[in-house]
Amino acid sequence: ETIRPEAEVVSRDMYIAYRSATSIAEGQTVTLFKYVANLSSMDYAFDKIEAAARDSALAAQAKGFAQLLAEQAAAWAAKWEGCDVSIEGDVAAQQAIRFNIFQMNQTYTGEDERLNIGPKGFTGEKYGGVTYWDTEAYGLPFYLKTAEPHVARQLLVYRYRHLDNAIKNAQKLGFKDGAALYPMVTINGEECHNEWEITFEEIHRNGAMTYAIYNYINHTGDRDYLAEFGLEVLIGVSRFWRQRVQWSDRRKGYVMLGVTGPNEYENNVNNNWYTNLLAQWTLRYAAESIAFVKASHPQRYAEISANGNSIVSAINR
C-alpha cells in the first residue's frame, strides 16, 4: 500500500527539511522513498533551476525505486566490465583496489569538459572540490587504462579551456609574450592558492600539464589532439620555461632558481631535478610537436605559426 502523508516544510538558517507523520499498526513496517534532484547553475539559469529540479525529481518518482535501481546497477556493471582489477590471495588488497576504482569512476565520467577531479574525490569535502595538478599526474593514467579515450581527453580539454587564464596568471608574475603558468589550485583557471612558496615556486605543475598531453597521445594515438588543442598549451608553457630560466656563467648552462619540488620537502631551492628535467623535456617535445603539426595540419599550423616559430628559435639558441 502506498501512503502519501502531508509534509510540513521546516526551514531555518542554512537548513530546510520536510516533516511528516503517519500511523501504523504493530508489526507493520514503513519504507520511505526519497527522490532527490541535484542540478547546477552551470547548466540552468538561476530563475529556472528550481523548476527544473522539481521536474527531475518528479520524473525519478514516476520511474520508481525498482527501475532506478536496475538502471544504476546496469550502468555500474558496464563500468566494472572494463576496469576491474582482480587480486588473488589477498582479500584486503582486493577490497582496497576496488574501493579506489569505485571512487575514481564515481568522481569523474568525462561527460563534461568543464569538470575535473577534486583531490578527495566525490565524497570528501577537504580542499573544496578544486583542481590540482594531481589530476594530470595521478588521475589521468587511470582513465587512460580503464576508460574510453574521450574520458581522458576531456581532462586535457579542461586545461586547454583555461589557457587564457594561465597566461593571465603568468602575467601577474611578470611573464609576457603569451607565457602560461597553470594554477596550483583552481576551479576556473584562476589561481586559488594562497601560500607563496607553493603558488610562486611549485611550478613543476606546468610540466604535469605538458606530460599529460604526451601521455594521452602515447596511449591513444590521437595525434590530431596536438593540432586541435595540445600545441597551444605546449607553446604557452614553453614560453614560460624560456623566461623562467637564466644563464649561469659559473655553470655554463641554464639554471632555475627559487623553486619547490613536488614532494614539498624543501621550499625555495635552486635547480630542483624534477622541475628542471620537465622544463627541458617540454621544450624538446614542443619543438617536435610544432614540426608534426606543420607537416600534418598546415592550415592549423598557419594559425599559430608565429607562436610556434618563436619557440623553435628559443630552443635552437
Give names to the regions the model predicted.
Residues 89, 123-133, 193-206, 263-276:
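Solvent-exposed loop and edge beta-strand segments that line ligand/cofactor-binding
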Residues 1-127:
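Acidic/polar, glycine-enriched structural segments that form the non-catalytic walls/loops
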Residues 81-86, 103-106, 137-149, 197, ...:
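Well-ordered alpha-helical scaffold segments within catalytic/enzyme domains
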Residues 190, 240-310:
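Acidic/histidine-rich catalytic neighborhood
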Residues 108-123, 149-211, 217, 224-228, ...:
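Helix-terminus loop motifs that line ligand-binding clefts
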Residues 96, 148-162, 225-241, 293-317:
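Extended, well-ordered alpha-helical scaffold segments
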